[in-house]
């Protein structure tokens, strides 16, 4: 019975996530088409709603080509590792009060640890491919993710100081009177920029810069290997936006403390906020040119890192001065 309940819990996390990832790709193509005054995918199904299924089926039935010079075992394991790590993080994300697989007291630390492991899948795929383009993309990715994780860690300290807990549910409940995005708005902007870089999204998509690296670390992958990298990237995007919703936008809490707003399911509020942040990802991708690699590193180490550290001192000072520590 325990194994059955465990399996049901895992399926209830994974299936909605996979559907969300599939339709996130469609939403991205539709929104970018609207911004660029195109139609976007509209052939498969009504308004192109079956396009993700067609894409998934196409990748599933394609032949997996293994490069003759590649390290085959690591080459196959790398995309699986990337995808699994993107899924494991979801077990501590609360979609509503009590709607979480594992409500651990060190949820923030757990997410940081898992996200830092994600770089291994990418760097091993670049190395195992035995291709200079793939390896260069993997090295860029490793440096980029490590650089911005430092800033993310320091930014999270500010939220932890205001909430007094590493537990995601308690962080959300600490925002019942006011969402943290209002007093910590500059920190939210820094965090949003950092998660764009952490998820390798435009304008920080240096590891897979199509124009210069022919798709980057996954250049040698086809069929399901490519699909797993793709799914992992989009699952990470949704995860980071969900994390931002929890840390700054009050998680599943409605925007105003009105009884009528509590009639709406908490999952709906959570989904709306996450969708809004995901739209920001797509909008930024459509609007901004790609950074040069030296600009990316300078932004991470010389601007975001000192600023996030300064904010830790400032927030600590304010909370201690006014005796506001939770």
UniProtKB/Swiss-Prot annotation:
It comes from the Eukaryota. The chain crosses the membrane at residues 1-21, 41-61, 72-92, 104-124, 152-172, 177-197, 234-256, 268-288, 303-323. Its EC number is 7.1.1.2. GO terms for biological process: aerobic respiration. Its main location: mitochondrion. It is found in: Mitochondrion inner membrane. One of its GO terms (cellular component) is mitochondrial inner membrane. InterPro entries: NADH_UbQ_OxRdtase_su1/FPO, NADH_UbQ_OxRdtase_su1_CS. Pfam families: NADHdh (PF00146). It is a multi-pass membrane protein. Keywords: Electron transport, Membrane, Mitochondrion, Mitochondrion inner membrane, NAD, Respiratory chain, Translocase, Transmembrane, Transmembrane helix, Transport, Ubiquinone. One of its GO terms (molecular function) is NADH dehydrogenase (ubiquinone) activity. It catalyses: a ubiquinone + NADH + 5 H(+)(in) = a ubiquinol + NAD(+) + 4 H(+)(out). Core subunit of the mitochondrial membrane respiratory chain NADH dehydrogenase (Complex I) that is believed to belong to the minimal assembly required for catalysis. Complex I functions in the transfer of electrons from NADH to the respiratory chain. The immediate electron acceptor for the enzyme is believed to be ubiquinone. Belongs to the complex I subunit 1 family. This is NADH-ubiquinone oxidoreductase chain 1.
